[in-house]
Amino acid sequence: MKAIVYTKYGPPEVLQLKEVEKPTPKDNEILIKNHATSVNYGDISTRNFKNIPLRDFHMPLPLLLPTRIAFGLRKPRKRILGSEFAGEIEEVGKNVKLFEKGDQVFGYLSMNMGAYAQYICISEDARVATKPANMNYEEAAVVPYGVIMALSLLRKVNIQPGQKVLVNGASGGIGSAAIQLAKYYGAEVTGVCGTPRLEFVRSLGADQVIDYTREDFTASSETYDLIFDILGKGSFSRCKGSLKENGCYLLASFKMKKLFQMLWTKIRGGKRVICALAFDKSEDLIFIKELVEAGKIKSIIDRSYPMEQAAEAHRYYEEGQHRGKVVITLDHNNKT
């Protein structure tokens, strides 16, 4: 089979299309003929892991060395990137009960990665579910990551109808999911983004949109129950004046300083910092599938690239001008 492989850390050009061995499912595994995957922040940072600046390492610094060892100090241990996928089950192990050959599925591999390949072999208990009936493979492949991350945080703070939510970084994968989920839960949502993306964020359902190049939301007298800072580029000290008395500052990352702030604000009470990573389950994907089929969550695709142009897809993502998700399609016409 064909896969997008990288054997050294570096720029997008390290991604190469190569022939690799097709996996064989074990008794409790399913073999998925993969049709689409995506480009996420995790793919970019993992590909360039050896050279990633400390300021962009979204984990506590004591975890830097163990993480480097896990991923590979000098070269990648896992040569195939990609965490999101959508495809069709081609073969099932003899003990598989949840799926059948021919089922159309989508899912999330998290840090295991491996979705930049024509075939994926995973346990039936992994983060995989039947694909939403109203989405094609490309649309389904870009849903899991952002929605799972946003859902994890919003559940953690028990979001309530009528609450005021601000999403800073509203046009990316997690931000666009956070807006749609907050609206589903009945919140009043404000999205913060740059000038070219204002209409895009409005189209997601945001009640208000702030252009950060013209207005600083922290300088306003407006206050919010929840402020969702997607990659933690702001700060709690800067944003806490914009939080209501018991408001929460939400982060989809957990640097050491943020963890200390989370612990301290939990002890102190009042305004709180909440850091969370998604310990997602297949049940979450089933819930997401239901939201998609009910029209509450839509897939936002900016560009789609064939697997031969994976480097170009990564380069475009790194430019930071995408609105929504970047897709990589996996052609099977000439597979081996």
Where is each model-derived feature located?
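Glycine-rich beta-strand-centered segment in the early N-terminal region that forms part
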Residues: 21-38, 52-111
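Short, well-ordered loop/turn sites that connect or cap secondary structure elements
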Residues: 99-100, 159, 243
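N-terminal Rossmann-like NAD(P) cofactor-binding module of classical short-chain dehydrogenase/reductase
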Residues: 106, 210, 227-228, 250
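A structural motif shared across PLP-dependent enzymes of the aminotransferase-like
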Residues: 111-124
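Mid-domain Rossmann-like dinucleotide-binding core that forms the NAD(H)/NADP(H) cofactor-binding site
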Residues: 140-211
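A short acidic, Gly/Pro-enriched loop at the edge of an enzyme's catalytic core
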Residues: 218-226
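Glycine-rich phosphate-binding loop and adjacent beta-alpha segment
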Residues: 230-297, 329-336
